[in-house]
Structure formats: C-alpha cells, structure tokens
Amino acid sequence: MSFPAPKPKAPELPQKLQHKLECNQGAVRAVRFNVDGNYCMTCGSDKTLKLWNPHKGTLLKTYSGHGYEVLDTAGSYDNSQMCSCSSDKTVILWDVAQGQVVRKFRGHAGKVNCVQFNEEATVIMSGSIDSSIRCWDCRSRRPEAIQILDEAKDGISSIKISDHEILAGSVDGNLRRYDLRKGEMCADYLGSPITCVSFSQDSQCLLASSLDSTLRLLDKDTGELLGEYTGHQNHSYKLDSCLSEKDTHVLSCSEDGTVCFWDLVEGSLVLKLPVGKAAVQSLSFHPSECCLLTASEGGVQLWRGASYEEEGGS
C-alpha cells in the first residue's frame, strides 16, 4: 500500500509588512526595484527621483533635474545608470553614483508616461501621451530619437522590453508587440484603455490591465486569451500590475487601497492585501524573491512572505 503523494506546498505570498519608507517627495508616482532587487527607485510628484535600500529602509541618493513630476524610472543591467521620464516631456539618463544628469532627451510633444532600457542599456525607449514610442541612443550625442514608433492612436501608458521585443499598451485599447529583428508589429485589441503591460518571466505570455477593472493574460505568439482576472478596482488611474517572480500569481494595484493576488492558472482571487486608504498606484515585484514593493499615500511599503526572517532569509 502506498501513501498518496503530499500536495506541493502553495507558494508564499508577500503579505508581511517589513519596512515603510517615508519618501517625502509628494505623491509617489512609481516604485521600481533595480535589476537584482537590492535597491529601489521612487518617482515623486515633487520632481525628484530617489534611490533607496528598501531592505534597510535607507535613502541613498536624491536626483534632481526634471522640471515637473517624475512618472517612471528604470535601472540599467549593471546598476551604473538610470533613466527617468516626466510630465515635463523629457527623458533623463542619470549617472547613479555621481547623481548627475548624463543626457536629457527632448522630442515628445506631451508628458512621458513610461521608460525602459534595452537589455544592454544602450537604448532608452519612452512612451508618451503624444501616442508615440521614441528610442534614444545613450551613446550618441545626437539629440533626436533614433526611431519613432507611432502606430498608436492614443497615449502610450506602459512599455516593457524582452530581448528583441517591445510590448506597448495604449489608451486606444490596443496591446502592441514589436519584433525588432523581424521588423513586425502585432496588435491585440482589448476593448478598454490599457494601463499596464508585462511579459511573464518566461516571456511566453503577456499581461495587460485595463480601465474596465480587468487583467488579461494572452499567449504571446497566438494572441489567444488565456485568462481574465477581476475583483480589483481600476476605473480612473494608471495602476501597475505584474506577475510574481515564479509566474504563479498575477498581481494588480487597486483604487480601494489594496493589492490583489490571483492564482495564474485557476484565475481565483486568493488575497486582497490591505495597503492603505488611498489608491495603490504602483508596485514592483522582486526579480527572484517573495518580496513586493507598493506605493501609496506618499510612502513605499516592503512586503515579505510570512516565514521570512530578517536575518538569514526565508
């Protein structure tokens, strides 16, 4: 007689509050882990960008150079540079250690919602309310964009890059994927303004959140709808969503002050994490650990799994 095999342990969710950062930079428009998850950046409505060690709760540096609120940021693969974008229509390339502006890129006709580096950090891509994605060469001194992608009929809300592919979400309701090697573009119409887009960790699936309070998971190659996730509130604001570090769960900010977690396969809402009273605008999942950053009410919160011990890890 054999015993039934034990059920695999359900993956932990980051629901234990570990640290709170009082950012002192107005409303925090975005929080982003760096590439290895040791640091994070916060974008403020007070025009500043800040670099933190969120695991210790310490501020490392403040970056000033934008003329209006900072809306998004990303770090380079080697942590030596950051890029950021702003309502002032500019994109800035920063030297992280020096705290200095390396380049300021101008060309967008309206506020710039999102920025990403390519994997080598030689090109910055930015998406704007002016309906365009612009590609900026970090190494060249030329001021104009090296490429402009202008297929969208309304503002670009979110972009992500994976290898040679760009994923872009637009207020026109289309999820567009650009294959830079083949020079091809595919579009999937989702029917509602898109607020955030993500690749899964294995780059086989696409996640898009929309202002109809629905997240959709699509097969990257076929565009087939694999799952829909509801139960959060997203009618008014540009809110972040993402997949957990092992692609087991879908996460989204919510306008009711929570972050929602769904089982990716089942589609069931498994946790509503209470973060604050106001809308949770931004989140960032650690690249390799059960660890989540959220931004709400001018501060940032760091969450860990329930079994995590401060000394020695989980």
From Swiss-Prot:
It holds the Pfam family Beta-prop_DCAF4. InterPro entries: G-protein_beta_WD-40_rep, WD40/YVTN_repeat-like_dom_sf, WD40_repeat_CS, WD40_repeat_dom_sf, WD40_rpt, WD_repeat_MORG1. Transmembrane segments: none annotated. The keyword Cell inner membrane does not apply. It is found in: Cytoplasm. SUPFAM superfamilies: WD40 repeat-like. Keywords: Cytoplasm, Repeat, WD repeat. Its main location: cytoplasm. WD repeats lie at residues 23-62, 65-104, 107-146, 151-188, 189-228, 231-272, 275-313. The keyword Cytoplasm applies. GO terms for cellular component: cytoplasm. Signal peptide: none annotated. Molecular scaffold protein for various multimeric protein complexes. Acts as a module in the assembly of a multicomponent scaffold for the ERK pathway, linking ERK responses to specific agonists. Also involved in response to hypoxia by acting as a negative regulator of HIF1A/HIF-1-alpha. Belongs to the WD repeat MORG1 family. This is WD repeat domain-containing protein 83. The lineage of its organism: Eukaryota, Metazoa, Chordata, Craniata, Vertebrata. The gene is wdr83.
